[in-house]
Swiss-Prot record:
Domain of life, source organism: Eukaryota
InterPro entries with a match to the protein in the record: At3g26010-like, At3g26010-like_b-prop, F-box-like_dom_sf, F-box_dom, Gal_Oxase/kelch_b-propeller
Native organism: Arabidopsis thaliana (Mouse-ear cress)
Protein name: F-box protein At3g26010
Stored PANTHER family: F-BOX DOMAIN-CONTAINING PROTEIN, F-BOX PROTEIN INTERACTION DOMAIN PROTEIN-RELATED
Disulphides: none
Residues in coiled coil: none
Domain F-box residue range list: 5-52
One Pfam assignment: F-box
Length: 414
């Protein structure tokens, strides 16, 4: 009996549709198949098709304590298909995580003059040259197009803080490195209050500070508009000056491209949770006001889900665990409590770091501000400054190791 081999020929359009349904980690491998496939995958059409197909899918993200410590990591999502937590791909044994913006990560060696910006999963890194004057890492901001794809980034470093107006206000002397020019520029920004803690958080091109000499306000500066040399002031919503009330706990976070202010207030009958979104006109919109069940106990808001403003993550001080709470469905789940939990099988929870971090924050009675390390919805290359060569992760590790060894030798010979 004769057996016939049949070859099925698929059109380019069908192949494109098939590719768009694969995780980015797999799609990246197809770029090396041929120049045609590489051109197709790097086209604007394919990029938009992929994002459209995966618009309801989450992407890998981690909740981190500034520095090197990973609290919670979500991976294995359909968008990237990572087998491990996002922080695994960052050479944290050698570098400190300073900031993140639209999938780009800013890391530094212990010497603030040495820092890198890159995508840890794509293993693409840009070495940022030192500024003219020694300064400390301040933040990472980025510029995106209408589809949310990164066009460029800026690294901001703090050179000097000048106290003004009899210790009421201050001026910041900063250096700004642009990926579009590859050079540092210097500028001075004026703040109407004293900044008591320079831990900041960023969204797009804007840096925000909330630890100020004046309670109940934020200050912000957009490094891409730069129409003014003044921080603008944003009053926090419904702020009754609970700064020293242990029943009041707040956090600044981001979700779905907006700054979010979330807070809890323990009352005799229930725990009240509120969430506001900062609109583009600097007004606050109340999204949630809801009583949470007493089974959660005395809890602290940690962060909103970066892609779903219905979901908040909370830390239970009484029971020492992280709760993922869906505000719309009223369902909650303790992360890491069930080994066979299908909804969170790709969730990494660092229990000791969670306890250490949240105990320190709660002990200081400060607002919670954790770093949301979020991969983008597309594997866009890191914007490369003019005449700068891209480095891979192995090269970064080798470079930093060599610097550390040289520093140790110089110290021993002093």
């Amino acid at each position: 009996m004769e057996t016939r081999n049949r070859t099925i020929h698929l059109t380019d359009a069908i192949w494109t549709e098939i590719l768009a349904r694969l995780p980015l980690r797999i799609i990246a491998r197809f770029k090396s198949v041929s120049k045609t496939w590489k051109s197709t995958i790097e086209s604007v059409y394919f990029r938009r098709l992929f994002v459209s197909v995966h618009r309801k899918s989450s992407t890998s993200w981690s909740l981190m304590w500034y520095g090197q410590k990973d609290l919670v990591g979500f991976h294995g999502c359909e968008t990237w298909g990572l087998p491990k937590s996002l922080s695994f791909y960052i050479p944290s044994s050698l570098c400190i995580i300073e900031g993140s913006s639209h999938g780009l990560v800013l890391i530094s060696e212990n010497d603030d003059d040495c820092c890198f910006v890159g995508n840890p999963v794509l293993q693409q890194w840009i070495k940022i040259p030192p500024p003219p004057v020694h300064s400390s890492v301040f933040g990472l901001v980025s510029r995106v197009d209408d589809d949310g794809f990164v066009l460029g980034f800026k690294v901001v470093k703090l050179a000097e803080v000048i106290v003004t107006n009899n210790y009421v206000s201050c001026s910041l002397s900063v250096f700004v490195y642009s990926s579009e020019t590859g050079i540092w520029t210097c500028k001075t920004i004026h703040c109407p209050y004293q900044i008591t803690n320079f831990g900041s958080f960023t969204l797009d091109g804007t840096i925000y500070f909330d630890h100020l000499s004046e309670p109940g306000v934020l200050v912000a500066y957009d490094f891409y508009s730069e129409i003014s040399d003044q921080f603008w002031v944003i009053p926090l919503p419904d702020h009754p000056n609970h700064g020293f009330n242990s029943d009041f706990k707040g956090a600044l976070t981001t979700s779905q491209g907006f700054v979010m202010y979330i807070r809890t207030l323990a009352q005799s009958s229930s725990n009240v949770f509120k969430a506001w979104r900062l609109n583009n006109d600097s007004t606050w919109q109340l999204l949630w006001k809801i009583g949470l069940p007493s089974l959660i106990g005395d809890y602290v808001p940690m962060a909103m889900h970066p892609f779903d403003s219905d979901i908040v993550h909370l830390w239970s001080q009484d029971h020492r665990h992280v709760v993922s709470w869906n505000l719309r469905t009223q369902k909650n789940r303790i992360l890491g409590a069930e080994d066979n939990d299908e909804d969170h099988k790709d969730c990494y929870l660092n229990q000791p770091v969670c306890e250490e971090c949240m105990d320190e924050i709660c002990g200081c009675k400060a607002s919670v501000r954790l770093l949301q390390l979020v991969l983008p919805r597309w594997m866009e290359s890191v914007p490369c400054p003019p005449q700068v060569e891209m480095m891979n992760t192995a090269s970064v590790i080798s470079y930093v190791t060599s610097m550390q060894e040289t520093m140790i030798r110089n110290w021993l010979h002093q």
